[in-house]
A protein has these predicted regions:
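Charge-biased, low-complexity intrinsically disordered regions
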Residues: 1, 46, 53, 58-61, ...
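Two-metal-ion RNase H-like nuclease active-site motif
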Residues: 2-23
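Short glycine-rich or small-residue beta-strand-to-loop segments that form or flank ligand, phosphate
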Residues: 18-19, 71-77, 102-103
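Gly/Ser/Thr-rich loops at beta-strand to alpha-helix junctions
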Residues: 21-24, 77-86, 106
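A glycine-rich, hydrophobic loop/mini-helix early in the fold
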Residues: 24-72, 78-79
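Long, charge-dense
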Residues: 50-51, 83, 87-124
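Active-site helix-to-loop segments that bind/position phosphate- or nucleotide-bearing substrates
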Residues: 111-135, 139, 148
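Charge-patterned, long linear interaction tracts outside catalytic cores
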Residues: 134-173
Length: 173
């Protein structure tokens, strides 16, 4: 795996946070593009028929109008289905962008601390120190980057059909 060197990590670095949830016909995948922890730039959606989401996420990102500006892909074990399989190394190679996987992922695993909280992560295609700088730039509070937090909220709203008033509109049965 080639380690990508990012020249400068600005507070407005564009990252994409990916969240997924199982549905009756496969896995719905949402990607949220954020500028650091400051602005939402876009929302992407795709579907994977199988449990290996690597190819579906790769294609979703490469087809996006944001592809040229996305510098890092953020994943979290806590925003993916338990049965889902994803290779952060293969994703990094396929998309040509580094991947930071919170909550584990593939070896090696590092620990990151922010404002009294800590999280473990793995980094593919980027050094540990660059990954920590990106996590710091893309996180407002705690240890969850804004892109991942908003991707999880968006997926939850779409999947559960919650309207703007917070009322669940999911049909019964």
């Amino acid at each position: 795996m080639v380690i990508k060197r990012l020249r400068q990590i600005k507070k407005e670095i564009r990252v994409i946070g990916v969240a997924a949830q199982c549905d009756p016909v496969g896995i719905t995948i949402i990607g949220v593009v954020f500028r650091g922890s400051l602005w939402l730039d876009g929302v992407l959606k795709t579907h994977s028929a199988g449990v290996d989401m690597t190819e579906a996420i790769s294609e979703m990102i490469k087809r996006s109008q944001h592809y040229g500006q996305i510098r890092v892909i953020l994943l979290s074990r806590f925003s993916l289905p338990m049965e889902a399989k994803i290779s952060s190394n293969n994703l990094s190679v396929n998309v040509g962008r580094p991947v930071i996987f919170l909550g584990g992922g593939e070896e090696p695993i590092y620990t990151w601390r922010n404002r009294g909280e800590q999280a473990v992560f793995s980094a593919s295609g980027i050094s540990r120190w660059s990954a920590e700088s990106i996590l710091k730039a893309s996180t407002r509070e705690g240890v969850t980057p804004e892109a991942l937090r908003v991707a999880t909220l968006t997926l939850s709203a779409l999947h559960n059909r919650v309207d703007a008033q917070g009322i669940n509109r999911t049909p019964p049965g």
